[in-house]
């Protein structure tokens, strides 16, 4: 095992003065912990919140027009690819193992009526996503709150 603490990248969908944006962030406050019967492993406790866990399958060609995440939520593609487009015009495509944290609650509709983000599948296979939806509301304003 290396002595260097790992870093895990994620995309953060956040709100800046009513406009959704995406920032590439890093989780990097890992500490070595042990659990009975296992070798040491790296942990970064991202908070303690009640959460719901869901598995969703987005069919080929699926598009979720402009909407906000209902609650702050981690989204991890397990297979297939999907995209997230924010109000600032940025579009990010993600595949298996890439991580997004959706926290765009509180957007203000723009001149075209866009509010929050669009998302959808990419390619010719469904996107299987795991969602971990936090019961707590949005965290502090700004990107990268788990950095």
Indicate residue ranges for each PLM-predicted region.
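A short glycine-rich, His/Asp/Glu-containing loop-to-beta-strand
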Residues: 16-66, 72, 126-127, 132
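Short, Lys/Arg- and Gly-enriched loop/turn segments at beta-strand edges
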Residues: 94, 107-119
């Amino acid at each position: 095992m290396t002595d260097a603490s790992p870093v895990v990248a994620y995309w953060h969908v956040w709100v800046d003065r009513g406009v959704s944006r995406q920032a590439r962030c890093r989780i990097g406050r890992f500490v070595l912990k042990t659990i009975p019967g296992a070798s040491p492993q790296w942990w970064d406790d991202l908070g303690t919140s009640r959460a719901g866990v869901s598995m969703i399958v987005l069919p080929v060609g699926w598009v979720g027009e402009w909407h906000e995440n209902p609650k702050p939520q981690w989204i991890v593609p397990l297979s297939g690819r999907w995209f997230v487009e924010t109000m600032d015009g940025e579009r990010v495509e993600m595949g298996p193992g890439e991580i997004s944290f959706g926290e765009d609650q509180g957007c203000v509709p723009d001149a075209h009526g866009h509010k929050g983000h669009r998302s959808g599948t990419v390619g010719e296979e469904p996107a299987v996503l795991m969602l971990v939806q936090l019961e707590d509301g949005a965290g502090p304003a700004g990107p990268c709150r788990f950095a």
